[in-house]
């Protein structure tokens, strides 16, 4: 028996070790956006007396995950004793110790510089293309034109040839907080550029590519949004699960505000990364409510409402990703933009929704105007449409790329027992008839 127990323990230990080795909780693969990533392209455009001039471009190839205010911050470590002489379209957050330089003082002398985008309204002589939006980068599916950010950097003490120059290492990307893991810089084919008149092509002298992937677990240890449900055929409103994103009785006191005294909450600064939440049973910054509103003969209607419970954060260019099998029959969408993502090729069950520019693309902080809403009209497909067993509710919802906590399926609003839509077996009908006869006798 002892030998058998020892062998079993060894086998269990081996399986656990193999599992922990093979899978990690920080895995960045996203089934809805399998090829999504942020690619940083470092193009050396010319050589200088002691270094080079490069254009660094950040491409957000993620379909529905964007970088919101206060924007991205890009960092790295120099391989040698490089310095940044000057920058256009961006700036280092710290200059560092430049005391050994006389005359021209570098823009940054730190071994590990951190670069941020410039703000809108920057003078034109300090701008380049795709800069100066405060570090905000749109999702690729939402607005490809603004899913790019660039800056120009003049590097010294770095080498002046392809063989003497060294790529930066330990690249980090904050957007604006943690969540992204960046790989090493890889030498790739030089980038090619087309002149304004489209009659001439040029190319970089040398190009490095850095790929960064996102993990929600690395970004936040707890969820950031939850989903509540309701339907016209049931009086029950299913709330977000209790403690979806945290609990009020946590060890951190003062982390939420009673909505009755919300009017006296001091403004702690726009887009403060530290949340100040309204006290709720779910304690999530964002709640998405899905309400099955109406059923017509050939159509059915849903109302979607997004509510912000964070007094320290507003959301510009927000987006919502919803999985539901009836999106293939979406007929009309009111006051939101829509784009199918189709992660499974011909199966259209995933939709990306976002606000209309200058109308409702800005979700204000918690308060009377801290919500946006829309209605969706679906056509009924006789082969699959039903209100039974929670079919009318979404399978998954993402807000700004983060997976929201759904209520358990057994709590969904069900059809009332007397509904004609509930299929009744012949056995049940026969049993009811038999009991009725017995009562009459």
Swiss-Prot record:
Expressed in roots, stems, leaves, flowers and siliques. Residues 1-28 form the signal peptide. Residues 418-441 form a propeptide. Keywords: Cell membrane, Glycoprotein, GPI-anchor, Lipoprotein, Membrane, Signal. Transmembrane segments: none annotated. A lipid is attached at residue 417 (GPI-anchor amidated asparagine). One of its GO terms (cellular component) is plasma membrane. Its main location: membrane. GO terms for biological process: cellulose microfibril organization; mucilage biosynthetic process involved in seed coat development; plant-type cell wall biogenesis; plant-type cell wall cellulose biosynthetic process; plant-type cell wall organization; seed coat development; seed development. It is a lipid-anchor; GPI-anchor. It comes from the Eukaryota. InterPro entries: COB_C, COBRA_pln. Glycans are attached at residues 37, 162, 170, 209, 234, 249, 314, 329, 348. This is COBRA-like protein 2. The lineage of its organism: Eukaryota, Viridiplantae, Streptophyta, Embryophyta, Tracheophyta.
